Structures are given as C-alpha cells and as structure tokens.
C-alpha cells in the first residue's frame, strides 16, 4: 500500500473531497486509511462505570485508499511511485518528482 501512517493526504473523492489531513492509521488488509478530521461518524457508547449516562462519540471512519492522494512537502498531490536510491527503495511523488520518505 502506498500510504503510510503519518503521511499528509488529500481526499480526492467522496463527501470530504478537497480536505487534507494526516493519516492516523493504515489498514493494508482492507486497503483503507483513517485520516484525521475526515469521514467523521457518531458512535453511541453504552453506559459504563466511567460514564454512567453513556455518550455519543465522534470518531473518524476508515476510507478507501483509492480516494486519497499523498501530498509532498510543497503540498502537491500526486500518485506515488517507487525507485531505488543508494540501494534503498523509496517512494516519490510522480507529479513533482520529490522523494516522500
């Protein structure tokens, strides 16, 4: 998967199109990522000893990795390519040519 935890990404499809955020969690087995401040959903939590009345929490839902593009340091969104530099495989932005790792 071309997206890693900590990458800054731009959402290119869906209700949050155009939003940028940091990847909190990458889920490679299901090809999804959790992006900070994107795809907010409400989760109803049952009452427990800490919160006797229960709560409605707002958490980020995972979105499909095809709906995001990685941003480089200059804020240019583009597809991710791989190349070998100094016997090390690195990711780079295909649009700007800048190395991401």
From Swiss-Prot:
Species this chain originates from: Lactococcus lactis subsp. cremoris (strain MG1363)
What parts of the sequence cross the membrane?
none
The record's NCBIfam families line, in alphabetical order, gives: rplX_bact
Q: What is the lineage of its organism?
A: Bacteria, Bacillati, Bacillota, Bacilli, Lactobacillales
Q: Which PANTHER family match?
A: MITOCHONDRIAL RIBOSOMAL PROTEIN L24
Fill in the subunit field for this protein: Part of the 50S ribosomal subunit.
Name of this protein: Large ribosomal subunit protein uL24
Q: What does this protein do?
A: One of two assembly initiator proteins, it binds directly to the 5'-end of the 23S rRNA, where it nucleates assembly of the 50S subunit. One of the proteins that surrounds the polypeptide exit tunnel on the outside of the subunit.
What GO biological process terms are annotated to this protein in UniProt? translation
Q: What's one GO MF term for it?
A: structural constituent of ribosome
Q: Can you cite an annotated GO cellular component?
A: ribonucleoprotein complex
Which protein family is named in the record? Answer: Belongs to the universal ribosomal protein uL24 family.
Q: Which keywords are on file for this protein?
A: Ribonucleoprotein, Ribosomal protein, RNA-binding, rRNA-binding
Identify the coding gene.
rplX
């Amino acid at each position: 998967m071309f997206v890693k935890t900590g990458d800054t990404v731009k959402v290119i499809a869906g209700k949050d199109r155009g939003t940028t955020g940091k990847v909190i969690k990458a889920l490679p087995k299901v090809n999804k990522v959790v992006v900070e401040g994107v795809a907010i959903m409400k989760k109803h939590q049952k009452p427990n000893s800490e919160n006797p009345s229960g709560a409605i929490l707002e958490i980020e839902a995972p979105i499909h990795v095809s709906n995001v593009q990685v941003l480089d340091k200059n804020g240019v969104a583009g597809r991710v390519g791989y190349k070998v530099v100094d016997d090390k495989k690195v990711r780079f932005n295909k649009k700007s040519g800048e190395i991401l790792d």
